[in-house]
Amino acid sequence: MPALPLDQLQITHKDPKTGQPKTSAALNPEQKADRYFVLYKPPPKDNIPALVEEYLERANFVANDLDWLLALPHDKFWCQVIFDETLQKCLDSYLHYVPRKFDEWVAPTPEVADMQNHLHRSVFLTFLRMSTHKESKDHFISPSAFGEILYNNFLFDIPKILDLCVLFGKGNSPLLQKMIGNIFTQQPSYYTDLDETIPTILQVFSNILQHCGLQGDGTSTTPQKLGERSPLTPSDMPLLELKDIVLYLCDTSTTLWAFLDIFPLACQTFQKHDFCYRLASFYEMAIPELESAIKKRRLEDSKLLGDMWQRLSHSKKKLMEVFHIILNQICLLPILESSCDNIQGFIEEFLQIFSSLLQEKRFLRDYDTFSPVAEDISLLQQASSALDETRTAYILQAVESAWEGVDRQKIKDIKDPPRAKGSNNEVTVTAEPVSEMPSQLENLEEDEECMGAAAALGPAVSGVELDSLISQVKDLLPDLGEGFILACLEHYSYDSEQVINNILEDRLAPELSQLDRGLERQVKPDPTPLLSSRHNIFQNDEFDVFSRDSVDLSRVHKGRRKEENVRSLVNDKQAVVAQWQRYQKYSVVVEEVPLQPGEYQADDYEDEYDDTYDGNQVGANDADSDDELISRRPFTIPQVLRTKMPGEVQEEEWDEEDEVEEEAPKPDHFIQDPAVLREKAEARRMAFLARKGYRPENSTAVTGGPRGHGQSRETTQERRKKEANKAARANHNRRTMADRKRSKGMIPS
């Protein structure tokens, strides 16, 4: 007889009241054991014995109850899970309060770390069994009833699934993928819940922007109250408030990435809400402001700011991965898996997503660094021959323009950490490293980002200050080497107190614990010593002892040479002989040129010929040929030296029509009457203007008659006209504008 599923199974048991056998459903509240599950509380941050003891006692109760629950048979387990509310509250409290791997928590004692790992494993196995509808061929639940049990009893919901992914995703990815996939497969209503949850996730981004003063309430039409303060920007808000925002962003981005990495089928639901564009817009507005705010506070608390910078870098990386997972799931993977006839829709979706992001310059740069856009477009070109080259070229050009003015340094992609492998019937659980130093964010951050954060927060300690820190540690722990102390100081941001405390409590980081404690300090050579970087006229010559090891000492002589005297030095013509070949090549020095009889050397200079006055046409000249006489310019007397001939006419400079003037009178060297000269000049000017057709205005009316005798009507009109038209005489229109102002009533009359 085949076994029945648990939801249809009937069991017979004795009625405690009547003692008679009674048949009831296997999933019955009466089958629930009377057991109270205590709530989980997070471990203490400080090593206070009372707090540690309280935590260990409570955690021990929770661990024992979960171990008892996991040991129950199939029907008893599901009765306890469905009908015991204290169990659900206990599991919810663990998901709510357990420290994440990016939280600021360090296990105060090894006992606390062991207990935390035990609880971590037990909670994961409990949820894993709750998500399995078939444990064996005899113990199973029908799929339809299983989905109803999960959904109607709130055993799983979207927030729980998100917490499960972020808490247990590392090292347990295959189990989580099977677990969450089974939940969504057996109960499709969870897709509807996820669709209703995504607006809340988008509201988280809006809340961060509003809290940073980067986005106002667009739905509000009422004006802001006078007494109401506008939100502070990240650069102005207190440091602890900025820290809370960074932690909130880190939690949100890590949770989203963990969920989509485990369950990528949810990407279609996310993209229904235009999630890619909303994510890129949030990234463009929030990330640069938060980075700038942290860099501006480099002098406040270097340790806290370094931790915040690492968390912000981690958030950036996870947001990039979220975008990449969605793009890869809804566009690229279907293109690779589909035939050529069905990929046009996916290609159009890819181009549409990037076309909406072209104005987000910072996001495009960071995503192009994380995953080059050109490679994705190259994949599209290989998959389809009908790809719109204009749109792809436009997208690539926009990505290149986003890099303008920025040093393009590619960062190596970080490989995913290895995941635990397990068979179908073998449960493999890797506990989270809750006891490790969270501020380092191990296995989360790339080395380049950490180094960039350290560089941005200020220069490293060096010189006398570094020697002082080393001596502080060495005075208390003299057996340690200076090299080991220096490595500890560099790891803990040059905090000598933290170094001493961690050494005494044996809580050093793993990379420091492996070092030799007697390691001596190594002197770092100067990268650019002066001797190797100098440059002068003796650089690399035969006597430069800094660039060569051996020098010919026979060429070096100190003092006066005794073998030679001044006469022998003067008679030494070796230098002249050495230059002879050079001058001979260029034919500069020629002593004698042999000539054959009858030859004439035209270049020779003849003393009998004197050409001193040839240029001035003075003296006896040789007879010239007819062609030379024709082509030569005739000699003329300069105009300044000429004497005016009686019949010659003179043209005035201002006569543009070349009209012939009357013959000028003979120059008179005596001084004439100035009044006569002025009259002649005025006559010449009037004659010139008359030829031009210029008619001067009659200004006699403006001049007027003598004072006290009155003015004529023409004089009064001309003066009024002159007063009104002063602007035409470069008076800048002051009178007209003054009248205009007065007519408008701006100036009292």
Swiss-Prot record:
Pfam families xref list: CUE
Keyword Transcription part of the UniProt annotation: yes
Region Disordered: start-end pairs: 1-26, 606-675, 689-749
Biased composition (Acidic residues): 649-662
Keywords per UniProt: DNA damage, DNA repair, Nucleus, Phosphoprotein, Transcription, Transcription regulation
Basic and acidic residues compositional bias, start-end: 663-675, 711-726
Cellular component, GO, one term: nucleus
Modified residues (Phosphothreonine): T233
Biological role stated in the UniProt entry: Ubiquitin-binding protein involved in DNA repair and rescue of stalled ribosomes. Plays a role in DNA damage repair as component of the ASCC complex. Recruits ASCC3 and ALKBH3 to sites of DNA damage by binding to polyubiquitinated proteins that have 'Lys-63'-linked polyubiquitin chains. Part of the ASC-1 complex that enhances NF-kappa-B, SRF and AP1 transactivation. Involved in activation of the ribosome quality control (RQC) pathway, a pathway that degrades nascent peptide chains during problematic translation.
Protein name, entry field: Activating signal cointegrator 1 complex subunit 2
Subunit comment: Identified in the ASCC complex that contains ASCC1, ASCC2 and ASCC3. Interacts directly with ASCC3. The ASCC complex interacts with ALKBH3. Interacts (via CUE domain) with 'Lys-63'-linked polyubiquitin chains, but not with 'Lys-48'-linked polyubiquitin chains. Part of the ASC-1 complex, that contains TRIP4, ASCC1, ASCC2 and ASCC3. Component of the RQT (ribosome quality control trigger) complex, that contains ASCC2, ASCC3 and TRIP4. Interacts with CSRP1. Interacts with PRPF8, a component of the spliceosome. Interacts with ZCCHC4.
The record's note on its domains: The CUE domain specifically binds RPS20/uS10 ubiquitinated via 'Lys-63'-linked ubiquitin chains by ZNF598.
UniProt main location, coarse: nucleus
Location(s) in or outside the cell: Nucleus; Nucleus speckle
GO molecular-function terms, A-Z: K63-linked polyubiquitin modification-dependent protein binding; ubiquitin binding
GO terms under biological process: DNA repair; regulation of DNA-templated transcription; rescue of stalled ribosome; ribosome disassembly; ribosome-associated ubiquitin-dependent protein catabolic process
